[in-house]
């Protein structure tokens, strides 16, 4: 790790300005940042660079979600060279590897110390309301009054479980990615993984390799290879400007914000984890879960169309990469363009699955997350 930021204080977490405290009343400060994960810490750096007095209020510890709400084998989807925060960049021995969760925690914890972030941990924000020309922030440890509030509490606080989960037979265990740690915590027997984005495909792969038969329910998804023409797909998307697209450059911002995460996994082998890879090891592929009636899960018949659309969009991305490589003189430096086999779909994917016959013992809801502003 390398940092180029010199904090005002010696190495260690920052302290609040004593002048911000009003004896016997609310604490006063310019800006309150809610959350001390990587986003909140990055905001702290930027505020400090501009001389803005602030405090970070954290309900637990720094990087709490990484410490308590991630499964054991998870690695970042992005290579180490992309792991950077304002004033801190990765400078380890393997820029093309992918951080494990302990490494992410260490990275974020170290960053908090490097920038001397003024953090108040074990502080739960209970309400935020407008007061005059500022805000009042109530917590379990007192009240703050401030000019500005930054909500950096994350976008993955609550697992989005569809309402149809209430119709699942009581004999079947249900878990979300926030609860899941490893296959050993699951019951023996078949597992239905609902959702085929990054989380769903990774968990389907891990659970199936543990010896539990897995059925994967896939709706709309984003397929991309881990490596293309000898370089990581993230390198290509960074170089071509795909990652630089602004919110005001898209036709439908709401749709853009709800595009599924790509089917990617971070591994030392840099292998592609798409639906073909999963069916190749024996995972059963079915369509989007549409409902549950009388103990039977009902699936959409649009699996083939969804897979064809994902293949089409992937090839459009690869075309963009090929054009950029040619225009920038890289064709002689990297392997030639190629295309991947289309997603293999059974002639007649099943449209129903009996949840009462004992074949399915667990359902994993890999159906996304949502923020919690309550």
Name what the model sees in each region.
Residues 63-89, 278:
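Redox-cofactor-proximal catalytic regions of oxidoreductases
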Residues 18-36, 41-68, 98-374:
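Flavin (primarily FAD) cofactor-binding/catalytic cores of flavoenzymes
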Residues 83-90, 254-255, 328:
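Short, basic/glycine-rich phosphate-binding loops at helix/coil junctions
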Residues 3-8, 17:
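Intrinsic-disorder-associated, low-complexity terminal segments enriched in Asp/Asn/His/Tyr and depleted
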Residues 93-95:
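A short acidic, glycine-rich active-site loop
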Residues 1-3, 221:
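Low-complexity, intrinsically disordered short segments enriched for Gly/Pro and polybasic residues
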